[in-house]
């Protein structure tokens, strides 16, 4: 779970008693609560389609990714996926951030945009993560026009996955693409950011990095013990300390119960 204020800044310092968790509208007892800068497993999904040439967006995105990697710690791990009309796993999980920086630096833009396929590949790869905290970071300037997978297929896979997705897209270039990204990201408890230009990428990359380091981890044993494979809807409610502005909670929308 992450918490932000009305202008998008992450919020730290909250305690267990400030949170309530509901599963299918039934309040659950929070058995586990922690906030600490734990190691992270991150997949970077990088748009290298032809439109990334415009406004030198490819260079700005490379610099932002390098910035994110340079802020890591030795226990973090990363992989890199690039996409145009083709989706490529450039680097599988590694703790050598310098290797990933080199891979990013050599990317050249061209082709169409298979964003759904790239996210699907990222969701598949993240299953091999070694760390409890997992995230995918999508950087794109457009909308899908070349995928084999559909929006509904990717969204369904995201519902099954224990990972938060963060999406950054350029505001002025996204039409339906904005809806596409929000539709997938929202269900995972991640966040979307739509800066007016990629000149603002560093700010949002820093925000994502800080948020990943300062997330709250809440755990509970469901009162519904039935192993029926059905979707269980989760809602996290915040009772913030007095004096704070209205805060926004970002948490995954639910999970599928195991089957017996």
List PLM regions with ranges.
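Scaffold/interface architecture of coatomer-like assemblies
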Residues: 2-260
């Amino acid at each position: 779970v992450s918490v932000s204020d009305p202008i998008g800044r992450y919020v730290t310092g909250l305690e267990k008693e400030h949170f309530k968790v509901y599963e299918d509208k039934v309040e659950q007892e929070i058995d586990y609560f922690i906030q600490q800068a734990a190691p992270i497993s991150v997949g970077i999904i990088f748009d290298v389609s032809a439109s990334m040439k415009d406004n030198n967006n490819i260079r700005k995105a490379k610099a932002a990714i390098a910035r994110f990697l340079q802020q890591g710690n030795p226990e973090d791990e990363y992989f890199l996926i690039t996409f145009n009309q083709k989706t490529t796993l450039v680097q599988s999980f590694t703790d050598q951030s310098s290797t990933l920086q080199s891979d990013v630096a050599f990317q050249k833009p061209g082709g169409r945009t298979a964003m759904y396929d790239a996210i699907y590949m990222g969701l598949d790869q993240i299953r091999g993560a070694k760390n409890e905290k997992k995230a995918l970071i999508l950087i794109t300037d457009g909308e899908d026009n070349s995928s084999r997978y559909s929006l509904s297929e990717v969204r369904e896979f995201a519902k099954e996955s224990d990972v938060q997705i963060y999406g950054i897209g350029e505001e002025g270039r996204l039409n339906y693409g904005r809806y596409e990204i929000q539709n997938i990201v929202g269900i995972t408890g991640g966040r979307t950011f739509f800066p007016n230009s990629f000149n603002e990428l560093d700010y949002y990359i820093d925000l994502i990095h800080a948020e990943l380091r300062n997330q709250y981890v809440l755990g509970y044993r469901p009162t519904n013990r039935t192993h029926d494979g059905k979707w269980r809807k989760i809602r996290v409610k915040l009772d913030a300390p007095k004096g704070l502005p209205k805060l926004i909670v970002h948490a995954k929308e639910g999970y599928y119960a195991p089957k017996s």
